[in-house]
Amino acid sequence: MLAVFQAWAYGVILYLIYLLLIWLWKEKIDTVLVGLFFGTLTAAQFIANKLVDYGIGVAPAGTVIFMTNVAVLDAMAIFYGRQFAMRAVRLGFFFQAAVAFAAWAAAQLPPPAWFAERAAVVDSVIAPSARIALASLAAYLISSTVDVYIVTKWPRLHILARVYSSSLISQVVDTAVFISLAFGPEAQIILGQILVKWAQIPLEALLIYGVRRYVSTLRTK
């Protein structure tokens, strides 16, 4: 269970860094959010190669930063609209595909003889199998679309009700699609990853309220 609390601590630190960036460039919050969206998406993709036992389930090490990516997407959808968020999602899909291809291409290049052993280790980290890469892309596109739809569907609901419900549902979709396509429908693995992701969802309030504060200030000027 200690790993869960460590993950919360890391999540809080990440959100504080994001809020600092938003404060520094508060006149360009939409640009900052887009940058954070693509940055966290890429980081999560590479960190995902390490698996962590969180006590409540086993999930990739990139789960923490991936959940901050979900929060950033929610913030874009809530404060800048569904179309804005979906443009980011579609661009993110092609961006992820390009990164996966670049990683695969890099793994095909021949290393010098003295680096061959280390290169094999590096290749195993940066270049996922075609099946895992395709599963990741499918899970991302489907779950992100579901997330944006839900968080913008009922604007009269309390902001946290929208954020938490969209994240809860979209992460079930994300995990089920990815695990089923990449490894087969392993219920135990799916449940473990869902629980780890759900444990991070309450922290999304830090980013959502932080962004709302600065967006509201800008709109009243």
Language-model region placement:
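Hydrophobic transmembrane alpha-helices
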Residues: M1-M76
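Alpha-helical transmembrane segments and their cytosolic interface
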Residues: M1-Y10, Y18, A161, S170-K221
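Short alpha-helical transmembrane interface motifs in multi-pass membrane proteins
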Residues: Y54-V58, A130-S136, A161-R162, I189-G192
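Internal alpha-helical transmembrane segments of multi-pass membrane proteins
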Residues: P128-A133, K153-V172, L218-K221
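Membrane-interface interhelical connector segments
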Residues: A105-A130
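Membrane-interface alpha-helices at helix entry/exit sites of multi-pass transporters
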Residues: Q83-L91, A161-Y164
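Transmembrane alpha-helix boundary signature
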Residues: F46-I56, F79, F101-W114
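Transmembrane alpha-helical segments of multi-pass membrane transport proteins and ion-pumping complexes
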Residues: Y15, Q45-F46, V70, D74, ...
